[in-house]
A protein has these predicted regions:
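Extracytoplasmic catalytic/substrate-binding loops of multi-pass membrane glycan-assembly enzymes
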Residues: 8-24, 31-34, 40-52, 62-65, ...
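Transmembrane-lumen/periplasm boundary regions of multi-pass, lipid-linked membrane glycan transferases
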Residues: 19-24, 151, 163-282, 292-304
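Short acidic/glycine- and proline-prone juxtamembrane loop motifs at membrane-interface regions
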Residues: 68, 110-121
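Transmembrane-helix motifs of polytopic, lipid-linked glycan transferases
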Residues: 69-89, 127
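Specific aromatic-rich, kink-prone transmembrane helix
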Residues: 81, 121-138, 318-321
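Transmembrane-helix signature of polytopic, membrane-embedded enzymes
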Residues: 82-104
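Membrane-interface transmembrane helices that cradle and orient dolichyl/undecaprenyl
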Residues: 88-89, 93, 128-145, 326
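Short periplasmic/luminal acceptor-recognition loop of GT-C membrane glycosyltransferases, typified by
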Residues: 351-445, 449-464, 476-478, 483-484
Length: 487
């Protein structure tokens, strides 16, 4: 169901365009340690996800397919792991229920059908969760613990929060200290526990060690700034003092969970008292799993930066602790209501069928990416001449069909710099937003092009200069051109 329509999908938002573009640029320029976006360093994420897209692009020859394969694989692995853990912790029936609950949840499709990094992160979180549960609740199993540690390391170089499964040690330590049944005690194993940290660091070093060596030996100011950005600003500083997606502390509980964790949230009025009873009976399995879910939610709640997909890593733990209660819930609801039971089965089948059908309907309905249409028209109007981009988004770079020039995605005074650049490049064009056109150019000499989701755009050349802008850039512009047709 997660893979329905995968061959029809294409990048549809800036995140998908960005990650696919970075992966394709890696294939083109051969720089695997430092990601680039239109020749400018992309500092926001480590490169493991982009490596994976590049690998699948090389294997399949289909970038639009390669973009969505990591999340699809993550969905398959997560479903299989949930089934196996449910079977081992309780029985085969509970394993099936856990897998179905995961596949029934709205957020599963919202995340795993997108070509974004959070679907790929789910793979490492689930492997970390699986290894920790096998060790802490079904162990001792040191091999699985080290698998979990390696997965967390790879999760960290995918997206910084890949360490989340380690939070399971907190409720586990409490359960061990209080003597709760259902958890495995492993006294006198301090060295083995610390070895897990070494395994996680070794996984991180797969990327970080070559990066540091490269920057130390051959790096310039930009690459050194990248190391500082990715290790400090994009991790601890972004968590403690987020500058994007700022939301109040109640955001996840009032705006995200009621919608994106459907239909699971509908059962919470019965589940919460049942969990309380299980905890009163000192069930260590429930304490560790439910405690981990609460800690993950708390972790993201404490950060001022919040997006709806951030809490997705908690979902596998939630369905695993819910699954044993589902048979009891179904008996409670439908034992004396055979007609209601038939309605419930019908609704469940419709729910799964609707998500499967939507996988094919959405890509057909969305059809061509608006920025792809924009850049195709621009290439035709300019006859493939050099193009200066201003206030651009990733789709304009990804779908460019001609050489592009820019002063940096977040540079100041981009329109003014474009006007100055055109004076020394009279055969080139610049793509200017409508609301900034009159600042530096004569509107009557500008040509309007296809609108995209970012608004109206106009093409100008040096003859449209109104002489009002004199903002010379202190640095040379970035230049980039796709060497081969890629999409």
């Amino acid at each position: 169901m997660v893979g329905a329509g995968i061959g029809l999908r294409q990048p549809g938002n800036v995140d998908e365009e960005r990650f696919l573009g970075v992966a394709l640029e890696m294939l083109q320029n051969g720089n695997w340690l430092i990601p680039h976006r239109a020749a400018e360093i992309y500092p926001d994420k480590p490169p493991l996800f982009m490596w994976t897209i590049a690998l699948f692009t090389r294997l399949t020859g289909a970038p639009n397919l390669a973009l969505f394969l990591p999340a699809l694989i993550a969905g398959v692995v997560t479903t299989a792991c949930l089934y196996d853990l449910g079977k081992r912790l309780w029985n085969r029936r509970i394993g099936v229920i856990a897998a179905l609950l995961f596949l029934a949840t709205y957020q599963t499709y919202s995340v795993l059908r997108a070509g974004q990094i959070d679907g790929f992160l789910c793979l490492w979180i689930m492997l970390g969760l699986y290894g920790m549960v096998r060790h802490l609740l079904l162990g001792p199993a040191w091999g699985w613990f080290y698998v979990a540690c390696a997965a967390m390391g790879f999760g960290i170089i995918s997206k910084g929060v890949g360490f989340l499964p380690v939070l399971m040690l907190i409720p586990y330590a409490y359960a061990v200290r209080k003597g709760w049944p259902g958890v495995v005690r492993m006294p006198g194993q301090g060295r083995a526990w610390w070895l897990g940290l070494g395994v996680a660091l070794a996984a991180i070093a797969v990327w970080l060690l070559p990066l540091v060596l490269y920057v130390t030996l051959y790096g310039d100011e930009a690459s050194r700034a990248y190391v500082s950005e990715i290790l400090l600003r994009q991790t601890a500083q972004r968590y403690a003092n987020a500058w994007h997606h700022q939301e109040p502390f109640w955001y996840f509980f009032l705006k995200v969970i009621p919608k994106y964790w459907l239909p699971l949230v509908l059962a919470l009025p019965w589940l919460v008292p049942a969990w309380r009873r299980q905890l009163s009976k000192r069930d260590g399995r429930v304490l560790v799993l439910l405690g981990w879910v609460v800690l993950v939610l708390l972790f993201f709640t404490l950060s001022s930066g919040k997006r709806k997909l951030y809490i997705f890593p908690a979902l596998p733990g939630l369905v695993l602790v819910m699954a044993p209660l589902v048979p009891w819930l179904l008996r409670r609801w439908f034992a004396q209501r055979p007609r209601a039971r038939k309605v419930f089965i019908g609704l469940a089948l419709f729910w799964f069928a609707a998500w499967f059908a939507r996988g094919f309907i959405e890509p057909i309905k969305e059809h061509l990416n608006v920025r792809q249409a924009l850049m195709a028209e621009v290439a035709g109007m300019t006859q493939g001449a050099e193009l200066m981009l201003t206030h651009w988004r990733e789709g304009q770079w990804l779908f460019a069909r001609q050489p592009i020039v820019h002063f940096g995605m977040d540079a100041a005074h981009q329109t003014q710099k474009a006007a100055d650049w055109l004076r020394s490049n009279p055969t080139a064009f610049a793509l200017i937003q409508a609301d900034e056109l009159a600042q530096c150019f004569k509107p009557d000499k500008a040509r309007k092009v296809e609108d995209d989701s970012a608004g109206e755009w106009f093409l100008v050349q040096g003859d449209a200069d109104n002489g009002q802008c004199h903002e010379r850039s202190a640095s040379a512009p970035f230049r980039f051109a796709w060497q081969l047709p890629h999409l």
